[in-house]
Structure formats: C-alpha cells, structure tokens
Amino acid sequence: MRVLFVSDVYFPRVNGVSTSIRTFRSDLAQLGIETLLVTPEYPGAAADADPSIIRVPSGGVPRDPEDRRFLGGPLKRVLNRELAAKVDLVHIHTPFIAHYAGVRFAREHGLPVVATYHTFFEDYLHHYVPILPRRIGRWIARRFTLSQCGDVAELISPSAPMREALQAYGVTTPIEVLPTGLGAESFIRGDGAKFRRQFDLPPDRPLLLYVGRVAFEKNIDFLLRMFARLLIRRPDALFVIAGEGPALAHLTRLSRELGIQAAVRFIGYLDRRTDLPNCYAAGDAFVFASRTETQGLVLLEAMAQGTPVVSTAELGTRSILTAESGAFVVPEEEEAFSAAVVQALKLAPDASRRAQLRAHAESWASLAMARRLVSFYEKVSLAYSQIRTGSLRDPVSSGA
C-alpha cells in the first residue's frame, strides 16, 4: 500500500503536526507501508534528503512568519502529473489548502480519503483574528470543522476527548481514536547536566520547563503568573521556555512586568534528537496548561525522561494524564498549580516516581500506534472498494 500524506505544515516548521507526520512515516516504513508527503517549501530551508518528501512552491501567510501556504497552480500540477497513478489512499493532516486539494485529488482519481483532526481551532481563533468576537469565532470554527469532517470517509482523532468534542459539533463521520505515540528517539536518555552547562544554568537550582510552540493558545501567560507566585516559596527556582512563536514578544514583556525576568529563560527551538532529550532530563518539573491540545505529546516526552509533570487536564491531555501516569493534575488556578509544583520539586529525586513516569510513556510507543494505523487504512480501503462495486452504501454521498 502507498499512502499520500498532504499537509500545509512540516519541518522545518516545528509543531505537533510535523512531529506526528514524521513519527508515523518512520514507523509505517518499518511496517512495509510506503508514504509520500506533499508539503510547502520553506525559504532558506535545507533540501530534503528523503525523495518521498515533495515540496511545492509556497507563499507567505499574513501575520504568521512561521507558516507557508501552498500555491494552487504548482500544487495541482504536482498532484495530478506526478502522483495520480502512484497512491492507494489519501491522508490529509491539515484543514487549509491541503484539505481541499487532497479531497479534490482523491475524488478525481477514485481514491479513499481520510483526515487527522490535529488542531482544535475553537478556543484560539480569537488570538489570530482579535477583531472577531469570541462567540462568532467559535461558531465559525464549528461550522468550518463540521463541513470539512463531512468531506472524508473517516477521521482520526488523537484522543477520546477530541472525538467527543467533534461529535458534540454534530460530526457524523466515523472517528477512530489513534494517538501518535512516541518515537524511539524519545526514550534515549538525555544528559541533563550537559544541558545545564550548555545554557549556563546552575546545577543546584530547581528547574521548571515548558517545551512547545510559544503561542497564545498554549496559555503560557498563566504559567508565568503561576511562576511569579512560586518564587515566593522557592526563590531559587528557574523557568526555561523552549520554543518559538507569535507570543514570544508578549511573554517577554510579561515576565518583565511581573518582575521575574531574571529567573525566566527563553531559549528558542531545540534539536529534537540531541538537545531536546537533554532539556527534559535537566528539568525538575515540566509545566503545561494549554487548553487546546488534541493530544499533548510533550507531556509524554517529558515523562519518557522521568521528569515530573504538573499540568491542567484539558481536552486531549486528559487521555495522557491518567491516575497511573504519575503526573500532578491540577486546576488552572495559580495557587493550586504552584503548590503542586512545590510538591513535584520535592519528589523530583524520587527514583520510583521517575520510573513510574517512564513506564507510562513507554505504553505510548509509536510503533504500536502505527500498526493500528495500518489496520485503519486497510479497513477504509476495503470499505471504499465495496462502495465502488456497489456492495456497500457510501455514507458521505448518501447523506447518512
């Protein structure tokens, strides 16, 4: 089987979608499934060594220098001239130009098409279109989602809570819950001491970590305010924020306004295969409070290094932050959260606690998830072939 992935984002753009695509493609290859990836070009990026990654000329995105948008003409030519006879199934990963191009391509060439719902737009659209009232933005996001989910044969949701949210919208397309899982590189033990030396962080000061996109929807404002409260109890604490994004300037100003800038370090993106494991290993507590995660892989990445996690449990993260995980799950309230961080710092040296966290992360190994994805593809392909031969009714075209 050969599967076409279509995505509006991929590396060097760092986010959860890029990570998910790379992880699944690597594991699917081990299982004998070939994938082709069509994604935008990024100016100045190094050429891909992998010939199965097909870059399409792109343009900029207003007010978003990190992202690119496909140019329609080149995208259509790539799909129709290079790929029409080469794929058995189309898998869409983003809801922008990639979605409409992927659906059109699949229909024109008689191919089954599925999509992964990676991004929960409802709660952060207003950050990027601030003139839009939040109530109207949510209505638009829901209608947009409902329409797109009806375009495909089946959907993949990274978590059960995300599936429940989609079904509450009125989505009737079948939804398979299938997390990405952690790739093997996440379990390579990091060198925390090396990371502290690299970034001139004292070895004896407790270190809080946030890793991820520095974006408004990640609710890092709350983490900074919580940290200001924590410093009253633990004035020796440091907070490292690893990542980049549109909220960086705002958060830098906020740290100054709170008077905590000397204890907060913004260090940018880290290399996933070298520096990032070391970063997690250096931490005494990983803190997270995003309200919009469809899964929350960074929580598992931290656990894989045995780093204590303190997090709210919103949307997709609820699937990870179970009672067995060993994580501290707290409400989005500064005092309660900071108290949990104090407790996590006390338990950070506990070897049994770290072992519990690692064991939980290991239960999310990505190869097992890839096997489930292969079964999903086979199921969808079989149902589609039955529809084509008239032995099974098409729920999309019939309106069921």
Residue ranges and their predicted role:
Residues 188-201:
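A short helix/loop element that forms part of the nucleotide-sugar donor recognition site in Leloir-type
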Residues 308-311:
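Short hydrophobic beta-strand element within catalytic cores of glycosyltransferases
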Residues 323-335, 343-349:
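Conserved acidic donor-binding segment of nucleotide-sugar-dependent glycosyltransferases
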